[in-house]
Amino acid sequence: MYNFIIILILFFTIIYCYKCEGIQFNDPGMKYFYKKNNIIYDKKRQLLIKNNKIADISNGLNGKKKYTDKNSMKKIFLDNGIPTSKWYIWNTNLPNSRNLEMLKLQNLNFPLVIKPYDTYGGVGVITDIYDFSRLMRIIPTISKTTDAIIIEEQVIGDTYRIFVFNNIILDIYKIRKPKIVGDGKSSVMKLLKKYINDPDVKLTKAQIDYDLIKKQGYNINSIIPKNKKVIITNVCNSTVGSEPLTVNKNNIHPANIELFKKVARTVNLNACGIDYITKDLEIPYYIYGSIIETNSKPGIKSYIKNNPNVIHKLLNNIKFK
């Protein structure tokens, strides 16, 4: 009887967690908009209430898919004609030699990017792996935190976050690469230490690309001139300190707009953050471009900061019934 009760509790806990997938409407910046529009936010049930009418702003039971399962999502992309990079799943329960043998059979092109299998938000992502020797140096560290690792061909270009709600593209942002800014007296190492210790940043030492820093003319002991910016990694995500830049949707090829809407429909999400890499958004995806992943719980904090109008678009597309 006791075991049955435990199982029952776990079941309803999981269902509740699924229900809570969706936009993070509890961001502090939303409170002003709720008050201005006479809206009540029910955090527990993920509902907005206005004039005795409600709007479900969760992704409901659509969230039962594990969107952090990168392998499953990439298979969904391929099955639906959505461009995504080639990949291999490195099973940490197998000998490294066996994994390496199978990886080579996949004929992935360098550079490669390595990610923990079931995380999101740029956590644990390491880019710019140009040879197998560096890959094998990184694997042991990543293996300590996950049972499987996804290794992908790295798509060269700029990273964009597309915010889709109810099949409407609310905004598109270019995610700029993390960088340190010189003060004319501090070394690269000191600036990196300060950057990593920022409580709002989740970048690890392993994610810092010293070769990239070297290509910009600096080493760990270099003093960076005042206000000079130095990119420290090609990992792009707000969690690692990347800054979003609003993109003019008029400069985006129509085929790409349709692709983003298709992705949201395919993964069956009302609220969706899509990560896309291309050299230029004016280039249609079928010539160059790749969907990296989707996020079933996109935060809106950075959107509020960079473009408050996106909240008005969001509220205008919420259906109260």
Region annotations inferred by a language model:
Residues 48-207, 253-257:
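Active-site nucleotide/adenylate-binding loops and adjacent lid/helix of ATP-dependent enzymes
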Residues 33, 76, 80, 259-267:
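Generic non-transmembrane alpha-helical segments
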Residues 192-282:
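A long amphipathic alpha-helix within ATP-dependent nucleotide-binding catalytic cores
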Residues 238-251, 265-271, 278-321:
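C-terminal active-site "lid" helix and adjoining low-complexity regulatory extension at the edge
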Residues 30, 101, 260:
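Aromatic/hydrophobic pocket-lining residues that form π-stacking "cages" and hydrophobic walls in ligand
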Residues 28, 37, 80, 106-108, ...:
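Residues at alpha-helix termini
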Residues 32, 47, 162, 275-277:
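Short acidic loop-to-beta-strand element that houses the catalytic metal-binding Asp/Glu
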Residues 2-68, 72-75, 93-97:
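ATP-binding N-terminal substructure of ATP-dependent carboxylate-amine bond-forming enzymes
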